[in-house]
Amino acid sequence: KKKNIRFIGDPQKRIEEDYLRIIRFIRFKIMYDTKVELTTSDIIKQNLDGIKKISKERILIELLKILDIKNFLNINQNSNLKEIFTKIFPEFLYLNRLERLKKVYNQSEFNRDILLGVLLIDEKDNHEYFLHKYNASNKIKNMLEKFSKNLIKLKNDKHFFEKDLIKNAYLDGKNHLIALNLINFSINSKVKEKDFLKIFNKVLKIKVPVFPIDGEYLKQKGMKEGQSLGKVLKILEKDWINNNFKISNERIEEIIKIS
């Protein structure tokens, strides 16, 4: 039998002391999968405006803790809790996508980055509003923007997970592609589970190439330390990638001379 979860002391007083306790209360409710007393739920709803008095930084810290809880995937099963959560975080427009994510998330490591991508990204830049509202870190910003950019690429490029797979794994990493596949499946109802699994297994099996040239190699070829060395490395790497991760000694010499 599930236990009720409640505030210690008078809920109204405890909430008024620090409105962040509302979000913490939700976190514990999700973590322990416990019931919320109706009276407690009503008091929380009556005090939701108080959350506006809390700094966005403090709210974001609590939100990220919530998204780290695996039980968050079941939030749609509790209409009362879902209602409170969506009133606090109205930018999470796509909680319904969790139902598709639940079908496949066991295939890879569950993490908050995937959840943020699933719940925020759409074709209207909803994630950008979230980033601005909560003054999110550069790490979160770069992660969401990378997911958004590659979801657009994936939509427009039928070769993204096919002949360009190794190239994309080299550029963005296998973990990113695994997460991207999960997000794309959750967002796009047209993607079949068997196709998701096919891509997932392909990503797992590929061996990511290692660029064989570094600064020391170029110095041995007579180049000096400086900006030009870094520039040549980038040109060589691009040529190597575009030539199916191969480059001849003759081509290396040619690029060094041109540069």
Where are these regions (language model features)?
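Conserved, surface-exposed functional patches that form binding/active-site neighborhoods
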Residues: 6, 12-13, 182-197, 213
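C-terminal accessory/binding modules appended to enzymatic or scaffolding proteins
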Residues: 191-234
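Short, mixed-charge aromatic SLiMs
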Residues: 45-58, 131-153, 202-209, 258-259
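Divalent metal-dependent catalytic cores for phosphoryl transfer on phosphate-bearing substrates
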Residues: 99-190
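Structured, non-catalytic alpha/beta "coupling" segments that mediate domain-domain communication
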Residues: 65-88, 168-192
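Glycine- and charge-enriched loop/helix tracts that form the active or gating conduit
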Residues: 1-132, 227-228, 232, 236-240, ...
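Hydrophobic, well-ordered secondary-structure elements that form the walls
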Residues: 148, 218, 222, 243
